[in-house]
Amino acid sequence: MQMSKSFLLITVGLASTSLQAQTLTRDNGAPVGDNQNSITAGENGSVLLQDVHLIQKLQRFARERIPERVVHARGTGAHGEFVASGDFSDLTVSAPFTEKGKVTPVFVRFSTVIHSKGSPETLRDPRGFATKFYTEQGNWDLVGNNLPVFFIRDSIKFPDMVHSLKPSPVTNVQDPNRFFDFFSHEPSATHMLTWVYSNLGTPASYRTMDGFGVHAYKWINQQGDVNYVKFQWKSQQGIKSLRPNKVTEMQGKDFNHLTNDLYAAIGRGNYPKWDLYVKVLSPEALSKLDYNGLDATKVWLNVPDRKVGTMTLNRLPENFFLETEQSAFAPSNLIPGIEPSEDRLLQGRLFAYADTQLYRLGANLFQLPVNRPLTSVNNHNQNGLSNNAQLSNGDVNYEPSRKLNLAEDNQFKAVETKLVGTVQQKAISKPRDFYQAGVLYRSMNEQDRSDLIANLAGDLNKVIDKDIKATMVSYFYRADKEYGSRLAEATDTNLSQVKNKAMM
């Protein structure tokens, strides 16, 4: 259809006048007269410092980035709800679990662990699975991964482990020579390495992976009874991962595949769901395990689980930075009825995660909408950068005081725990570094075993030091002889040397 020039001009004119334009302003609210040209000294003169609009735009642009998370930098989030499947008040007084059908709002952030913000989501890595429950008792963060165990059992090794897995300070490239050098001194990592080098280390979708709390926690009921629990999110979408050839194919097509898939599914109303299960052990039953039940490198074998609720993610963030990037998760964000166990890795995470969020977002991070509790916050924490809280306590910013009745509630005191022994600095008892890696390997079908060997060999064959390679293969041999023998063949490692190391 041919349209006249005058018709086009009239149409464009009508369209432009129909918009209710708002006046562009500076941050102080003052209107901007020209956003296209800087103020200069004459036609060809220098730009003037008095151009405050230009200066402010450049200043704000230079400050758009906040510190990147040291781990879990690349992530995506979604809002949703958790619905309890029963009344579990016999086990815990935690609000989400005390009434069948109770609805608790949640925000979930999925992430890669080691790689940086702009990295491909196809890279092999554990995946973070962090859930913030907004309860009437405060915010509870269940900060986990898509794999049930971790590389180390003591938080004192966490900085070293992350340093080895991060890019080299010389080349700025991740290097298997570095992280296998570290892991050759950490046989406890054998179990986790078997998990992460399986195809579960390259999930096809955030929707098609499970989540685990990794650590044991304590559930406490109204009577003060204590049980140890482990949490697992089971995907109602099933488990789907990328095989080695599909990883390369996907990276060539879409290295944002995890984010794009989640956004597309929720955007079209295909809301993903996960059932939350818990394994429960009494302190007595925990002590009778033939491994240390508080060891983050272990799963609780043959312990039955029970479903406690279902989570549905049904709303996407309106702004990535305000919601997903500024969301702050920490295992120390606990509510009544849930306490940390004595797990040595968890004990360190209680401090480290909260501290890194203070560094990244500042002391008033809980005033950010995505981190703000539904309950009123009543304490005497004050001031700091970007504090916009309306304090109503007047002159009283301390406790106790006769002027203000803001007191503790004894019913929420920490549970008492009996301690025996002496202050010490020793490794845990019953480490059993290799046993569960063997159980995992033998549970795999042949295709999954072959992919595991191929994935591991792909990185081990980049290791120059043959002693490091042989040591690593010996760990997998100790887990399962077939496992180690196949890996020795795939890495051209002398099997006799492997067997000798396995006997050491």
UniProtKB/Swiss-Prot annotation:
SUPFAM superfamilies: Heme-dependent catalase-like (SSF56634). GO terms for cellular component: cytoplasm; periplasmic space. Keywords: Heme, Hydrogen peroxide, Iron, Metal-binding, Oxidoreductase, Periplasm, Peroxidase, Signal. PROSITE patterns: CATALASE_1, CATALASE_2, CATALASE_3. The active site is at H72, N145. InterPro entries: Catalase, Catalase_AS, Catalase_clade1/3, Catalase_core, Catalase_haem_BS, Catalase_immune_responsive, Catalase_sf. Heme binds at Y353. It is found in: Periplasm. It catalyses: 2 H2O2 = O2 + 2 H2O. The keyword Metal-binding applies. Its cofactor is heme. Pfam families: Catalase (PF00199), Catalase-rel (PF06628). It is an enzyme of class 1 (oxidoreductase). Decomposes hydrogen peroxide into water and oxygen; serves to protect cells from the toxic effects of hydrogen peroxide. Belongs to the catalase family. This is Catalase. The lineage of its organism: Bacteria, Pseudomonadati, Pseudomonadota, Gammaproteobacteria, Vibrionales.
